[in-house]
From Swiss-Prot:
ATP binds at residues 201, 292, 323, 349-352. It is found in: Cytoplasm. Monomer. Pfam families: PGK. Its EC number is 2.7.2.3. The gene is pgk. It catalyses: (2R)-3-phosphoglycerate + ATP = (2R)-3-phospho-glyceroyl phosphate + ADP. Keywords: ATP-binding, Cytoplasm, Glycolysis, Kinase, Nucleotide-binding, Transferase. This is Phosphoglycerate kinase. The lineage of its organism: Bacteria, Pseudomonadati, Spirochaetota, Spirochaetia, Spirochaetales. It is an enzyme of class 2 (transferase). Transmembrane segments: none annotated. Belongs to the phosphoglycerate kinase family.
Length: 392
């Protein structure tokens, strides 16, 4: 199913109500990472060039349905003004007569930013009345907030009941690349799934399994799979309640002739602490007193080998305790291998995206997804409310 996009509409003189994802990290009122703001620029610039009056809306943080100036979008308005080279007017609310009046005074090419939509509890409740109030500021609804596409909120899907709805360039790109992974991946297709828990990744593992030729499983969840295979995992993370689930998953992989790569050597520690001394274990088995913290050199060699000939790669989740520098090598090396892969490469999920950015490799990846939970749910095959309302 394809989505309607901004290229399908005439925006001249129209009010484009654009849902962006400006949920950026702030420290003492200053933006520490403006990646999400920059990601919205192509859509905003295009709408301006088409003569639209651009009305932007977003959430920021969790103000719990109350007006809390700590979560005001004012810093975003300032940064947008700098990036666009024009004044972006910040409105003091997102609904109401004053907002409608301010929007009605806009000229073609003007850009305004509404205040945080989550200052109203009705936003997350997907209140019909609140969605209707928001819709009064637009003629066409543009959803460019892939990061919140898995939420059925008033500003992400409710507004589409009142206005024609299309996707912005960011939404279109996410749908195109993640959709390609699920619908028609070119073989050999390698899935690399990391993260700490089987429970949080089993749905994406099961969704990608029938499409994959090779599946790499790393991170804390790998130890539950190794336990199923009969190996010693020491004091490593184990989800006993997922032993049967992991066992039937490995059986299914065998039936489908999918090669599953689990760690064959490890970097371990005596305690789960940032400054624990890393030790190398040249074996699949982990000593009883040790905790698996990262994948070892032999495992990395194996992953490098399958990636060198892959035509499609999806990577979601870290391969070790990436937040501790001593145990980040596995994730860092995999980021490098994915970047050097000649095929289509898609990276989604907070830590894997952070790894790619940390080592300045994002320019070598075909597509770096902007959605954490949204990417995961998309790859699980779930219907995302923010995308469903855009479908043709």
């Amino acid at each position: 199913m394809s989505i309607r996009t901004i290229k399908d509409c005439d925006f001249s003189g129209k009010r484009a109500l654009v849902r962006c994802d400006f949920n950026v990290p702030l420290r003492e009122g200053n933006i520490t990472d403006d990646t999400r703001i920059k990601a919205a620029l192509p859509t905003i610039e295009y709408l301006k060039s088409q003569g639209a009056r651009v009305v932007l809306m977003s959430h920021l943080g969790r103000p719990k349905g109350e007006k809390n100036l700590r979560y005001s979008l004012m810093p975003i308005a300032r940064r947008l003004s700098e990036l666009l080279g024009q004044d972006v007017k910040m409105l003091s609310d997102c609904i109401g007569d004053e907002v409608v009046t301010a929007v009605s005074c806009m000229q073609n090419g003007d850009v305004v930013l509404l205040e945080n939509v989550r200052f109203y509890k009705e936003e997350e409740e997907n209140s019909d009345a609140f969605a209707m109030q928001l819709s009064k500021s637009g003629d066409i609804f543009v959803n460019d907030a892939f990061g919140t596409a898995h939420r059925a909120h008033a500003s992400t899907s409710g507004v589409a009941s009142y206005l024609p709805a299309v996707g912005g360039f960011l939404m279109e790109r996410e749908d195109e690349f993640l959709g390609k992974i699920l619908k028609n991946p070119e073989s050999p297709f390698v899935s690399i799934i990391g993260g700490s828990k089987v429970s949080s990744k089993i749905a994406v593992l099961e969704s990608l399994l029938p499409k994959s030729n090779v599946m790499v499983i790393g991170g804390g969840m790998a130890y539950t799979f190794l336990k199923v295979e009969g190996y010693s995992i020491g004091k490593s993370l184990l989800e006993n309640e997922y032993i049967d689930v992991a066992s039937s998953f490995l059986k299914k992989a065998k039936e489908l002739s999918v090669e599953v790569i689990l760690p064959i050597d490890h970097v371990v520690a005596s305690e789960f602490q940032e400054y624990s001394m890393p030790e190398y274990v040249d074996s699949v088995n982990i000593p009883d007193s040790k905790i698996g913290m990262d994948i070892g050199e032999k495992t990395l060699k194996k992953i490098e080998g399958v990636l060198s000939s892959a035509k499609t790669v999806i990577w979601n989740g870290p391969l070790g305790v990436f937040e501790f520098d001593s145990f980040a090598k596995g994730t860092a090396k995999v980021a490098e291998y994915v970047a050097n892969c000649p095929g289509i490469t898609v990276v989604g999920g907070g830590d894997s995206v952070a790894a790619v950015n940390k080592f300045n490799l994002s320019g070598k990846i075909t597509h770096v997804s902007t959605g954490g939970g949204a990417s995961l749910e998309y790859l699980e095959g779930k219907v995302l409310p923010g995308i469903k309302v855009l479908e043709v």
